[in-house]
Amino acid sequence: MTNIRKAHPLAKIINNSLIDLPAPSNISTWWNFGSLLAACLALQILTGLFLAMHYTSDTTTAFSSVAHICRDVNYGWLIRYMHANGASMFFICLYMHVGRGLYYGSYTLTETWNIGIILLFTIMATAFMGYVLPWGQMSFWGATVITNLLSAIPYIGTNLVEWIWGGFSVDKATLTRFFAFHFILPFVASALVMVHLLFLHETGSNNPSGISSNSDKIPFHPYYTIKDILGTLLLILILMLLVMFSPDLLGDPDNYIPANPLSTPPHIKPEWYFLFAYAILRSIPNKLGGVLALLLSILILVIIPLLHTSKQRGMMFRPISQCLFWLLVADLLTLTWIGGQPVEHPFITIGQLASILYFTILLVLMPIAGIIENNILKW
């Protein structure tokens, strides 16, 4: 008799994706982040669902409803802080996952990579809209500043902004629609995750060596299921340490002040995971130029496969490219720091230099390094 997991139409899909899936025998912990991201998404949908049961998307009651969740709802504080810090963990895992893809040349699986970029945009949009919902000062002004950037689009800009706002300023209509989108987008992301996996399973996973692993595959279960469970437990441990001991460590104190359109906070800044892009936006004195640079800072990932000049897939045996990769990581950390600083000397100059370096590494230096390394191999 055939095993039910191999015969049943639904069980067969799960079996071929999570149990009998042939996986490379040498994938490292850097390959854990996919499952960690799935765990984060599940956690965010679950905690978000319970928050939505008590939240009201009205400008007069939104702030109070969040306070009510924290004070009066059973374990409401826990659900709220798990959701807020879960987003931070989500982005840490996201950036690690993308970084792994860049380092080991996983972007050569172009369909998987491109769906991943769409996923990244979806989750960034979700996080941005989620930050607006508590209706604190930073929520309101963050929404105002970021949506206002669309007014830089020639001809249709102003109409577009007012259409998104649902009026002439960020108000009740904006909050209501942001809540609606914030609720629906994670489900869109879940569907995209399925497509992401579909494309990945067409080709199979990459591995640290960058060479084909078809001659040496092992079943996903039990080897990688147990490895993923370990990773998930560590993720939950770090998240719960954050939630229990310093839930507001990564937040902004200004968001505990109710939104006031008449009082601008001294430093308007997004959540920490958007600071690098915000720094790139601010480093260009022109509004439209800044918006384009902001978009390109993420969209540049689309052309990474086209800029691959090396004969080797990953960077495991390419020291020059390795140096450039870690320089890029340092540069992104610098941009993140700059994004949180006021717009004054010397931060403006540092931000501009870091922004130029970011694009130079990806567009110029890495392709050149690939060519140099190809030539070194001939000697």
Swiss-Prot record:
PROSITE patterns linked: CYTB_CTER (PS51003), CYTB_NTER (PS51002)
Primary subcellular site in the record, as a coarse category: mitochondrion
UniProt signal peptide: none
Location of this chain's protein in the cell: Mitochondrion inner membrane
GO biological processes: mitochondrial electron transport, ubiquinol to cytochrome c
PANTHER family referenced in this protein's UniProt entry, alphabetically: CYTOCHROME B
Name of the protein described by the UniProt record: Cytochrome b
